[in-house]
Regions:
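Edge strands and adjacent loops of beta-rich recognition modules
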Residues: 24-34, 59
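Secretory-pathway-linked proteins and extracytosolic
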Residues: 44, 56-61, 65, 69-195
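Solvent-exposed beta-hairpin/edge-strand motifs
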Residues: 1-18, 76-92
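Short amphipathic beta-strand and strand-loop transition segments with alternating hydrophobic
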Residues: 26, 39, 125-127
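A glycine-rich, hydrophobic loop/mini-helix early in the fold
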Residues: 14, 23-24
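Short, mixed-charge, low-aromatic patches
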Residues: 5-9, 34-38, 156-165
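Non-catalytic accessory/assembly modules
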Residues: 9, 37-47, 51, 67, ...
Length: 195
């Protein structure tokens, strides 16, 4: 879902122009990725643009990061994510700014999950379960642009952002299964490596 608006001040009044469907272009990047590109309507110097979009993804290891800051100022930068509680993620925030708003809500939802068999002769199993869904929301207001400064090697290291990494599966009635390593597991893997 993609929505976008351009706001211009004309004769002392704010004029809102909505993004039309014919200004949205789809590009199939790969078997699993579709990119939507769009051209903002009525863009003029001094205008304000607003856009929002939703990403639905089955790729658990690729929970999208969000940059709250960029090369242009942002009046309001918001990121919302919903994830089932049986997928545990760690979040990493970066940058010098703190969140103006940080919310978490929990609701219940029913899921159908396919569990692959352990070997070639064991069939996949589908289970139905009800579990919590965690809804997170982070907001930064009046975010200044990030500008290149002398002696700065990479602006990417300073941009205000949030990113995620899957750390464990935690299904009800099953043992927790960590997927993110730590220094102890890394050392153990190195010691057990035959090469």
């Amino acid at each position: 879902k993609l929505r976008a608006y351009t706001y211009n001040l004309q004769n002392g009044k704010v004029v809102e122009t909505k993004l039309s469907d014919d200004a949205i272009f789809k590009e199939k990047k790969s078997k699993n990725t579709v990119i939507k590109k769009f051209t903002m309507p009525a863009v003029q110097p001094g205008c304000i643009i607003e856009y929002s979009y939703t990403i639905n993804s089955d790729f658990l290891f690729n929970l999208q990061p969000w940059n709250f800051q960029g090369s242009y100022p942002r009046l309001w930068s918001e990121y919302e994510v919903e994830m089932p509680s049986f997928f545990e993620y760690v979040s990493f925030s970066q940058g010098y700014r703190k969140f103006d708003i940080e919310d978490k809500k929990t609701s219940s939802q029913m899921f159908r999950i396919r569990i692959p068999g352990n070997n070639s002769w064991e069939k996949d199993e589908t289970i139905t379960m009800t579990d919590d869904v965690n809804q997170y929301r982070w907001i930064m207001k009046n975010v200044p642009p990030l500008k290149e400064e002398k002696y700065t090697s990479s602006l990417d290291d300073y941009v205000s952002r949030i990113a995620f990494q899957l750390s464990a599966y935690n299904f009800k009635d099953q043992p927790k299964k960590p997927v993110m390593g730590n220094w102890f597991t890394a050392a153990e893997d190195l010691m057990n490596d035959e090469s």
